[in-house]
Amino acid sequence: MLQPTLTSWVILAGGQASRMGGKDKGLIALNNKPLIEYVIDRLTPQTSNILINANRNQDDYQQYGPVFGDHFQNFPGPMGGIHAGLLHASTDWVGFVPCDCPRINEDLVERFCRAVTDETDILVAHDGDHQQPVFTLYHKRVLPKLTAFLERGDRKIILLYKECHTQYVDFSDSPDCFVNLNTPEELTQFGQLES
C-alpha cells in the first residue's frame, strides 16, 4: 500500500463559482464556518501535506496552507487546478478534493492509497453510479499528458482517462462524501439539515 505520508492533497478552490453568484465557494460560510474549513477538518487527520489551489482571494486562503493559482489563465476548470497541483506538490502522488464538499470521508486518503498499483496513473472515486472526477489521485508522470491535453484545449476529462492507466476507487458505501454545495439554495438547505 502507498503510504499516505507519500502523498500531497490539493483542495480545489480555483473555480469561478458561477452558480454561486461568483462568490468564492471555499470562503462562503456554512453555519458560520467557511466551506474550506470543513474540508480541512476532514483531511488534516489523514495527511499533513495539504495545499490549496485558488485563483482569487489567495491572501484569505493562505491562513489554511500553501496557496497557488492555475498556470493556464483561461479557467480550464478543475483540470487547471489539477495541472497546477501536479506542478507544485513535492510528492509523486497528488490527490485532489473540491472545496465545497463538507462530508469528505474520514478514510478517503487511505482508500486511495490502498488502491494504487504499479501501473496506476490516475485513481478516481466512484460512488456506485457515477465517477467523481474531482475526488482523485494522480501520479506526477501524468503531467506531460495533462499539459498537452490542456494546450490542445481539451476539457473532457474522460479523454485524459483514456490516455492514462486509470482505475476507480469504490465509495459506493458512502455517497454522502460527494455532497457538494453549488448554489445558495443548496447551501441554505444543507445548513438547515446540519443544524
UniProtKB/Swiss-Prot annotation:
Keyword Cytoplasm carried by entry: yes
Keywords attached to this entry: Cytoplasm, GTP-binding, Magnesium, Metal-binding, Molybdenum cofactor biosynthesis, Nucleotide-binding, Transferase
Keyword Hydrolase annotated: no
Disulfide bridge positions per record: none
Binding site for GTP: L12, A13, G14, K25, N53, D70, D100
Catalytic activity: Mo-molybdopterin + GTP + H(+) = Mo-molybdopterin guanine dinucleotide + diphosphate
Subcellular location: Cytoplasm
Main location as per UniProt: cytoplasm
Gene Ontology terms for molecular function: GTP binding; metal ion binding; molybdenum cofactor guanylyltransferase activity
Required cofactor names: Mg(2+)
EC number: 2.7.7.77
GO CC terms: cytoplasm
GO biological-process terms attached to the record: bis(molybdopterin guanine dinucleotide)molybdenum biosynthetic process
Pfam families, A to Z: NTP_transf_3
Residues at which Mg(2+) binds: D100
Known function: Transfers a GMP moiety from GTP to Mo-molybdopterin (Mo-MPT) cofactor (Moco or molybdenum cofactor) to form Mo-molybdopterin guanine dinucleotide (Mo-MGD) cofactor.
PANTHER family: MOLYBDENUM COFACTOR GUANYLYLTRANSFERASE (PTHR19136:SF81)
Quaternary structure note: Monomer.
Domain notes: The N-terminal domain determines nucleotide recognition and specific binding, while the C-terminal domain determines the specific binding to the target protein.
Family: Belongs to the MobA family.
Protein's name according to its UniProt entry: Molybdenum cofactor guanylyltransferase
Higher taxonomy: Bacteria, Pseudomonadati, Pseudomonadota, Gammaproteobacteria, Vibrionales
